[in-house]
């Protein structure tokens, strides 16, 4: 399903080796919390939730280059409208047990956070 006009939240987190396991733990908790709390229909609907994980490479343009030891986590959530993102953040602060742990973990990693962006182009 194409998502043009919907709203995307994207986080890219580069975790040093000593913090990668905490990322795994946080995202397991996050997925369970998302599944239990998020809307599936209407203007607040969560349309997709994807987390990917890969070793960081010394040369990102060369898939055969040596790993740095860091781990890259990429989180993408797509919502029907901005209202879904607003609801997400309100719920996270109020009900997710690991919200503070995630914020603390971000401080230990190299993070790029895009909390709310309109999707311009989308296929299928």
Predicted segments — roles?
Residues 70, 96-100:
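N-terminal soluble domains immediately following signal/targeting peptides that reside
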């Amino acid at each position: 399903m194409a998502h043009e006009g919907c709203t995307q939240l994207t986080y890219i987190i580069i975790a040093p080796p000593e913090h990668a396991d905490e990322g795994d733990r946080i995202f397991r908790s996050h997925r369970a919390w998302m599944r239990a709390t998020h809307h599936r229909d209407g203007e607040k609907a969560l349309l997709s939730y994807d987390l990917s994980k890969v070793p960081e490479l010394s040369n990102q343009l060369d898939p055969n280059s040596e790993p740095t030891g860091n781990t890259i986590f990429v989180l993408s959530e797509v919502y029907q409208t901005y209202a879904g993102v607003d609801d997400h953040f309100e719920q996270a602060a109020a009900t997710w047990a690991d919200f503070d742990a995630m914020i603390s973990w971000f401080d230990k990693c190299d993070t790029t956070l895009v909390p709310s962006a309109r999707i311009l182009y989308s296929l299928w």
